[in-house]
């Protein structure tokens, strides 16, 4: 099981994921498909919870999202 960053939920991470996704004109289902191509299987429900700040993404998911969004960690964690 992938390690969590911490146990405290942080809605800013989800907000940043939504912002980065929309800036790249991607739908949530597109990002989920790209994650699956990288061998990371998340359901639409889990991804929605991550975007809404109800679940923290694993380190594995964060790394994959920075690759999908072609951004660095500073951009990913902006405003934290």
Each PLM stretch: what is its role?
Residues 17, 31-32, 47-50, 76:
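Conserved hydrophobic/aromatic packing and binding residues within compact polymer-binding modules
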Residues 36-56:
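Recognition helix of helix-turn-helix/homeodomain-like DNA-binding domains
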Residues 17, 28, 44, 59-62:
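Helix-turn-helix DNA-binding elements, focusing on the entry/boundary residues of the two helices
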Residues 15-36:
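Short basic helix-loop element that most often maps to the first helix and adjoining turn
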Residues 56-75:
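DNA major-groove recognition helix of helix-turn-helix/homeodomain DNA-binding modules
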Residues 79:
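Conserved short acidic donor-positioning loop in nucleotide-sugar-dependent glycosyltransferases
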Residues 1-12:
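A detector for short, charged/polar N-terminal pre-domain segments
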């Amino acid at each position: 099981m992938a390690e969590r960053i911490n146990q405290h939920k942080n809605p800013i991470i989800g907000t940043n994921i939504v912002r980065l996704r929309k800036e790249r004109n991607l739908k949530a289902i597109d990002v989920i498909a790209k994650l699956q191509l990288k061998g990371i299987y998340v359901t639409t429900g889990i991804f929605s919870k991550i975007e809404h700040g109800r679940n923290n993404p694993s380190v594995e998911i964060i790394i994959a999202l920075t690759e999908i969004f072609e951004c660095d960690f500073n951009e990913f964690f902006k405003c934290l």
